[in-house]
Amino acid sequence: MPACFECNNGFSSDEKYVSCFLDVLKESVYQGYTRRADTSKRLSDDIDLSNLIAEQIKLIDGKVKFAVDANKLRRILLKLAQGHAGYEFDHINFDNSNITIWYEFAFNLSLDMVQEFEEIPQMDIMPEVGSRISVTPFILQNVETGEALAFMLWNEVQEDQYRYQVFYNEAGGVSVKIVIYELLYARIDFDLG
């Protein structure tokens, strides 16, 4: 996905914020989880970021209270989704697409909601020949009828840290699902109509 120098580097501080925020939040919510070493280093190297996150994630009366910077989070989710969709489906023009960004934290999701989110969608249509995703679907074939079905599996980039899935949605647009630290669940829909 091409990007000018300014655009590509303009996300750095937001990416650092989102990564550190999510890791610190996970450590605050889940006993037994210890934040990553690179998160601790980033926070010790950037006192302003450390203070900001300490202000946004607090333990009050035994409960974790937090307030994420939704603009930064949405901006990073959109950047990631555009990159994944462009990588998997080759060329997609996002310029005039309507975009819907949904996200929620694991501790706010029911088991049914997680299972629905985790579903592996069947691909009824395939992207253009030559795109990465046109050679990576999981194909199941009924040996009796010969009927074949294609499914889009999750791409696990870092185990328990980051994974994503790209597929055509029910409306004919492109959807990208992202899970970060097994804490943040996000779905970004692009209506390409």
Segments from the language model and where they lie:
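C-terminal, charged low-complexity interaction regions
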Residues: 70-193
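Hydrophobic transmembrane alpha-helix bundles
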Residues: 14-17, 51-64, 130-139
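Short flanking/linker segments adjacent to small metal-binding domains or redox-active Cys/His motifs
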Residues: 41-82
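Short Cys/His-centered divalent metal-binding micro-motifs
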Residues: 2-22
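A broadly used, surface-exposed interaction patch
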Residues: 7, 22-37
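Short Fe-S-cluster ligation motifs
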Residues: 1-2, 32-48
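Short amphipathic alpha-helical patches
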Residues: 27-31, 45, 103-104
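Alpha-helix initiation and N-capping motif
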Residues: 15-18, 27, 36, 46
